[in-house]
Structures are given as structure tokens and as C-alpha cells.
Amino acid sequence: MSTHEVTLAIDMADGLSADAGETRALGSLLAEDYRSADPFPHIVIDGILPEGLIRKILDHFPQKRQDKDVVFDIGYGGQHKRQVMPEECDGFVREFFHFMNSKPVLSFVEGLTGIEGLLPDPYFSGGGFHETTRGGKLGIHADFRINGQLNLQRRVNLLIYLNETWSDDWKGHLELWDKGMTTCRASVAPIWNRCVVFSTDAQTWHGHPDELQTPDGVARRSIALYYYTASKHILDEVPNLSTMYQARPDDPAAIKSEARRFKTDEYLRDWLPPILFRGINRLRRLPGRIARMRRS
């Protein structure tokens, strides 16, 4: 398994910020390795967050169960696993998760994966902090495809591990399996500040299915974020209209005519083939061009 040493240039001087152009360029540098990875597009990046930032994140990890924690004790589908919602964490943690849903991070992931138009999930469905304790596991699985709350397609998973020390004897490695579930093609130790990004579809099989053998009081902790795309089929359901204008009853005739023109243009843009709409616009501009030629 190959890894990359890369740190996002995150400025902590006034909140959390980064340059989206720089993060996209950084992702693009890693894109070829990501897209050619076996058994499906993925990458392992060590040192993804500045040390001061990830140290502070761990310091603010909620030690006690929160009211909205999602707890899994269902065997192969998740055992001794706890999901902590960012909304129940302190202000710094909330700010961090909001940053991870912002343009600089989305730009990095877009540059890395080649998937444009990525969208975050402000509700963190399935995401947030994850914690698994001794005896816990998560069976090999492919993730849900559609976010039912947002009606978006899940495309990319991003995980960052928060485990300062980790022994191979403790198990808990993230396993990536081939589509036929015949061979584990990659095994990733969940070590400190290691990030795993991978594309997700119906056959991106992954999990950590062996029971954790951590000492008492030691948990496997991670940050989990998921990114989505909208479907172009929305154009089959909703008219592709831009801003629609309406004149007021007492507006002058010229204003009413202008508003009708805007509205008519939008309906024509939605109804007509693009080449025909462009032709109509050229014809509309023709009288003005003729008048200018005569004046000159």
C-alpha cells in the first residue's frame, strides 16, 4: 500500500480558512494515483491536517455520550460503535466540521477525484466523529447510495484517524475488497492524522470486520465526512428557468414590456433547442445593428 505525505495549508489565525485554488491544485497533483488505485479509486494521505489543528480536535473529542449519539451494537453491521453528531460538540468542533464542508475542502476533493459539483451534507448523515471500543467492528459493506433527506447521490468518503498510538495487534485496519469479494486488496492502519479518501458505489466494499483487540480504555476514533452530487434528472422534473421578473400593476408600459421580455426569454430558453434560441436572439439584435450601421 502506498501513502502520500501531504498537509492542507489551513490558516488557524482567524477561525479556519484555506485558499480553494491552492487546495484544488494540491488535489489535482494526487489525482492520477487516486483514480488508478486498486480495487477502486482511493488514496491514503498521512499528515493531512496541521499538527496543531488535529491535536486540538482530539482534545475536544466528546468523552461522554451525547443525547443524539447513534450507537451500534448489531454485530457485523456495527458493534460497540458510536457516532457523535457535530451539532452536539463544542464551538471549535462545530467550526471544524463546517470548514470540512466548505469550498476549500470540496475543491481539494474535486481536484483529487475528478468529480465536479460535489456537495456537503449539513446534517452529517452517518458522519461526524466515530468511535469503536474493544470488541467492536464494522463488517465489510458498500455504503448507502442516496441521501434520502437531501435526495443526493453519495460519491466520496473522507476519513481522518485520531489514534495517537496504534498496534497492528489491535486489528481495526480498514480493508478494501475487490468487487467480487474474493480478495482484500488494501489494508490501512488507522494511525494518527491519516486520511483515506475513496469513491463509493454499489461495489466499493470496505470495513474493519475483525474485533478490536485494543487495551481497555483505548478506542478507535475517526472523523467521517461524505460528499454528494445532485442528479441532472432534476431537469426532467423542474423547468430550467432562471430568475423570473414581474412588473407591478402601476409600473410604466416600458417596464411591463421589459419584464415580459425577461419572462418570455426564460420560457423560450427552457422550451427550445439551444441552437434555435441563439438564432432568435441574433434576429432580435439585428435591427439594432442595422441602425448603428446607418448612423455610422
Task: Give the role of each language-model region.
Residues 42, 141, 206:
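Histidine-centered active-site/metal-ligand motif
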Residues 44, 119-122, 128, 197-198, ...:
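A structural signal for short, well-ordered beta-strand segments and their strand-loop junctions
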Residues 157-159:
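Eukaryotic charged/polar low-complexity linker/IDR segments
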Residues 5, 147-154, 164-296:
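Catalytic core of Fe(II)/2-oxoglutarate
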Residues 1-31:
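N- or domain-start disorder-to-order transition segments that initiate the globular core
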Residues 22, 31-112:
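Non-heme Fe(II)/2-oxoglutarate
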Residues 77-83, 112-121, 130, 134-137, ...:
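A structural signal for the main folded, soluble domain(s) of proteins
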Residues 59-62, 88, 99-154, 163:
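Non-heme Fe(II) oxygenase catalytic core, chiefly the N-lobe of the double-stranded beta-helix
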